[in-house]
């Protein structure tokens, strides 16, 4: 190995990573307009905290009942949308993707995006858990195919066989997947999320 090869190392491009995560948040808001209610509640909560002495620095709580029309949504997900796209292998079968909100907290929400249609018997359909940070207006992949807690950078080789920039690649893949849903997908479910303001 040459001296130049030894000195070459991966450096994190934080600006690019944050831009990818911010763009993913915007894509998710377009795919699931229901998420705007979570974002609005978070911003109102932040504004209420800074509004003055009447709040005494306490951030007001809101619960799922503030968002969900009781009984109108499935028990396993607070909000679910499904999209269908044409198959990339051209066999005429539609590829279905489901996006579900699985957790809601004051400033964050957790979503799961999974491909329901198996395109190939040799490849598992992808699945990603996404954390949305409503106060920071960003979204990042926190788990992919059962792997989680990704570091920003890995040494190579490593025991898990991750790429040096595994986290960036997963967030980039998420962006491409969401873009595909926006461009070629059609929603199979109408919005079921009702805000009780």
Predicted regions mapped to residue ranges:
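An exposed acidic His-Trp-rich patch
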Residues: 115-196
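Eukaryotic low-complexity, non-globular regulatory regions
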Residues: 1-94, 98-108, 179-197
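Short beta-strand segments that buttress and anchor functional surface loops
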Residues: 85-87, 112-118
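Hydrophobic residues positioned within well-ordered beta-strands of beta-sheet architectures
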Residues: 97, 111-113, 128
């Amino acid at each position: 190995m040459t001296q130049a090869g030894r000195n070459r190392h991966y450096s994190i491009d934080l600006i690019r990573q944050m831009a990818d995560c911010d763009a993913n948040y915007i894509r998710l808001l377009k795919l699931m307009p229901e998420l705007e209610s979570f974002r609005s509640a978070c911003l109102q909560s932040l504004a209420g905290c800074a509004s003055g002495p009447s709040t005494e620095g306490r951030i007001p709580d809101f619960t799922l009942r503030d968002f969900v029309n009781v009984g109108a949504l499935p028990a396993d997900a607070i909000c679910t949308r499904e999209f269908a796209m044409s198959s990339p292998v051209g066999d005429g079968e539609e590829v279905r993707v489901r996006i579900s909100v699985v957790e809601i907290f004051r400033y964050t929400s957790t979503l799961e995006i999974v491909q329901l249609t198996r395109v190939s018997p040799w490849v598992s359909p992808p699945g990603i858990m996404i954390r949305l940070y409503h106060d920071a207006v960003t979204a990042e992949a926190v788990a992919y195919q059962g792997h989680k807690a990704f570091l920003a950078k890995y040494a190579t080789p490593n025991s898990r066989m991750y790429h040096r920039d595994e986290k960036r690649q997963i967030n980039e893949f998420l962006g491409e997947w969401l873009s595909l849903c926006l461009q070629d997908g059609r929603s199979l479910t109408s919005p079921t999320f009702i805000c009780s303001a």
